[in-house]
Design a protein with these regions (language model features):
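S-adenosyl-L-methionine-dependent methyltransferase catalytic core, i.e., the SAM/SAH-binding region
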Residues: 1, 6-133
Length: 133
């Protein structure tokens, strides 16, 4: 049967016998998030954006990216650390990293408890900053 509306997908999902009713809302949100990411090509767009930033920034310029889920965050973290979204570090003949970026700090900046209380949507946000070498 064709799924025309999101409610139809939710109904199909709820009929599955292994779905935990306590986790139903979170799991269903993840299904819709995965569909949105795939349909909108969000990961491809992010990868393209990151690669273009290297060309757009001058040496010493800073790149700041806010991510909202782990797939985005992993891609941004890898890019800022290695210069590649897959995390594979390229090295020169002397074994030195040839990454065009250097992360500022090893951990992302996350919202405070007070900010999350005022703005619940911020709870999953992570800010990462890097400098172009």
């Amino acid at each position: 049967r064709d799924l025309v509306r999101s409610r139809g997908l939710g109904d199909v999902y709820k009929r599955q016998p292994l779905i935990s009713r306590a986790k139903e809302k979170k799991e269903l949100a993840q299904v819709f998030q995965a569909l949105r990411i795939a349909v909108n090509g969000e990961m491809d767009a992010l990868e393209s954006f990151l690669n273009q930033c290297v060309e757009a920034l001058r040496p010493g310029g800073r790149l700041a990216v806010i991510t909202y889920h782990s797939l985005e965050d992993r891609m941004v973290k890898n890019f800022m650390r290695t210069g590649r979204t897959d995390g594979h570090e390229e090295k020169d003949l002397f074994g030195r990293s040839s990454s065009p970026m250097k992360p500022l700090g090893s951990k992302p900046i996350v919202p405070t408890d007070d900010e999350v209380e005022r703005n619940p949507r911020s709870r999953s946000a992570k800010l990462r900053v890097a400098t172009k070498l």
